[in-house]
Amino acid sequence: MSEGVDLIDIYADEEFNQDPEFNNTDQIDLYDDVLTATSQPSDDRSSSTEPPPPVRQEPSPKPNNKTPAILYTYSGLRNRRAAVYVGSFSWWTTDQQLIQVIRSIGVYDVVELKFAENRANGQSKGYAEVVVASENSVHKLLELLPGKVLNGEKVDVRPATRQNLSQFEAQARKRECVRVPRGGIPPRAHSRDSSDSADGRATPSENLVPSSARVDKPPSVLPYFNRPPSALPLMGLPPPPIPPPPPLSSSFGVPPPPPGIHYQHLMPPPPRLPPHLAVPPPGAIPPALHLNPAFFPPPNATVGPPPDTYMKASAPYNHHGSRDSGPPPSTVSEAEFEDIMKRNRAISSSAISKAVSGASAGDYSDAIETLLTAIAVIKQSRVANDERCRVLISSLKDCLHGIEAKSYSVGASGSSSRKRHRSRERSPSRSRESSRRHRDLLHNEDRHDDYFQERNREHERHRDRERDRHH
């Protein structure tokens, strides 16, 4: 029978009599030596020369007694993994580099390698969990790996406990706060604050990602949302040359943007146009024209309080006392602005195409008149002071200068030698006079209407002279 409630006698409910000749009272249970001596493990196995201890008569346990407990014993590594935390390395350290350092101390049984990563951007936090196959490897890692240099920094090794995990997490937060960009490329952790979870501390199941999911690639620069404008120099770019733009006026129907958002993709242009925008090719629209002009004032305009209308802040010629050649100030909605700009682009493209075609056919007068008409129409539009309109006008003027130079170089040459002779006599003086007039009038935008009328009279006189010459 069994002793106490800690063990189970598997033969308590049935008799172990295999031969009916033996009497139950005379039977010696071979299992009594084991079951009755559990309190003294050293007496489990008795010598064959010693007589068996007498069978103690004890009452059998009641049927409704307490359920006996089953005991289990385990070895040291059967219930937990052999793992350590390795940290204090740089965020761009790869799993292959870490494994090479581990193998350099004689540990080759690495089972798993998990990097702690930011959930926001997938960047390493600078520590990892290393799982090995034996306790001996754990001792080697704890004794030999600390102090090893990995990417210029000495690694730190600690047992894989919750307390050490919290310490490595705190170190990772401090490193993110004081990290300096290397080579002008800021780490991705600077794209947002170093708070990865609701309670401020990341859990191992959330931040320890298997090494197979890590992709070693150069860091990318993300927009600096939720960061103050002072974080802009971290990008390796010079500070903006002009102050931040004023908020949008109420005439646009759009509320001003929140002050905490920094529009990196809408960086303001430099105060003066670069060389490739000074003389663009005919019909080409220079880059960076997709920016909304409402966010950035023109380069030659003084940044002040929000203007009441769209046009008042961009009138650079009124302080000279001359009349305003632009359209009267008026409010322009965003949809109307885009519609006018689309129409101006179509006018500019059509005029340049027609002028180039006419100049190729030798009809320089019509080509020049077409370009002058397009310039006048765009200047009279309600968004003429916008930077994009000025670029369109500049393209038209460049095309006009090219056609005029070609027309005066050709002159009034015809098929007969007499016409060529008379052209040589008259062309130099007329060419110099007309070129000087064109330069003076084109650079003075306030006299554009007078210039247009003067050009018409000049063309009429030229046609009269040609008609008289033929007659």
UniProtKB/Swiss-Prot annotation:
Belongs to the RRM CPSF6/7 family. Its main location: nucleus. It holds the Pfam family RRM_1. Contains an Arg/Ser-rich domain composed of arginine-serine dipeptide repeats within the C-terminal region that is necessary and sufficient for activating mRNA 3'-processing. This is Cleavage and polyadenylation specificity factor subunit 7. There is a cross-link at K354 (Glycyl lysine isopeptide (Lys-Gly) (interchain with G-Cter in SUMO2)). Component of the cleavage factor Im (CFIm) complex which is a heterotetramer composed of two subunits of NUDT21/CPSF5 and two subunits of CPSF6 or CPSF7 or a heterodimer of CPSF6 and CPSF7. The cleavage factor Im (CFIm) complex associates with the CPSF and CSTF complexes to promote the assembly of the core mRNA 3'-processing machinery. Interacts with NUDT21/CPSF5. One of its GO terms (molecular function) is RNA binding. It comes from the Eukaryota. Residues 190-199, 425-434, 441-471 have a biased composition (Basic and acidic residues). Residues 418-469 are annotated as: Arg/Ser-rich domain. The keyword Acetylation does not apply. It is found in: Nucleus; Cytoplasm. Component of the cleavage factor Im (CFIm) complex that functions as an activator of the pre-mRNA 3'-end cleavage and polyadenylation processing required for the maturation of pre-mRNA into functional mRNAs. CFIm contributes to the recruitment of multiprotein complexes on specific sequences on the pre-mRNA 3'-end, so called cleavage and polyadenylation signals (pA signals). Most pre-mRNAs contain multiple pA signals, resulting in alternative cleavage and polyadenylation (APA) producing mRNAs with variable 3'-end formation. Residues 33-69, 176-220, 409-471 are annotated as: Disordered. Keywords: Cytoplasm, Isopeptide bond, Methylation, mRNA processing, Nucleus, Phosphoprotein, RNA-binding, Ubl conjugation. InterPro entries: CPSF6/7, CPSF7_RRM, Nucleotide-bd_a/b_plait_sf, RBD_domain_sf, RRM_dom. The lineage of its organism: Eukaryota, Metazoa, Chordata, Craniata, Vertebrata. The gene is CPSF7. Residues 82-162 form the RRM domain. GO terms for cellular component: cytoplasm; membrane; mRNA cleavage and polyadenylation specificity factor complex; mRNA cleavage factor complex; nucleoplasm; nucleus.
